């Protein structure tokens, strides 16, 4: 059976998948890194949708996820999840990162989405070590898809070659590619 998990190197904002995941901050108001890139590419409709979510439920806690429209993106929707800031690994960061991936997958499944694309959550300015973050991402996604039919296709979208190699190596070790 062809693998359901894929690694791509490039710009997550260009993917025509059902839903892309935004590594958001708790304010949901946009920021740097992939968060800023997604907001810029999606246009003002995304910020308006995030403001509406925030008015309804307040900030998005670390490890949680919310879903909005995609604005001008080719994706159908955006799931915004808040990964943890790395603080030496002594503040439940591993579990919170796991929760960010898991809650994103659950939202995609609940909305019937067949394809989802993830950035490397928390590995930019939040400082989560790349190798540890990739292991958590791959394990969380792999465990989820063994028990669920949706999403059918999961993409890890890496901004650079180093992360791409890291994810490919982990998937090869698991026998998923």
Swiss-Prot record:
- Active site, per annotation: 35 (proton acceptor)
| Top-level class of the enzyme under EC nomenclature | hydrolase
Macro domain mapped to chain residues: 1-175
Q: Which UniProt keywords apply?
A: Hydrolase
The answer to whether keyword Hydrolase applies is: yes
> Is Manganese included in the keywords of this UniProt record?
no
**SMART domains cross-referenced by the UniProt entry:** A1pp (SM00506)
What EC number(s) are associated with this protein in UniProt? Answer: 3.1.1.106
User: What SUPFAM superfamilies does UniProt report for this protein, alphabetically?
Assistant: Macro domain-like
> Could you state a single Gene Ontology molecular function term?
O-acetyl-ADP-ribose deacetylase activity
| Self-association and partners | Homodimer. Interacts with RNase III.
Function comment: Deacetylates O-acetyl-ADP ribose to yield ADP-ribose and free acetate. Down-regulates ribonuclease 3 (RNase III) activity. Acts by interacting directly with the region of the ribonuclease that is required for dimerization/activation.
State the protein's name: O-acetyl-ADP-ribose deacetylase
**The organism of origin for this protein:** Escherichia fergusonii (strain ATCC 35469 / DSM 13698 / CCUG 18766 / IAM 14443 / JCM 21226 / LMG 7866 / NBRC 102419 / NCTC 12128 / CDC 0568-73)
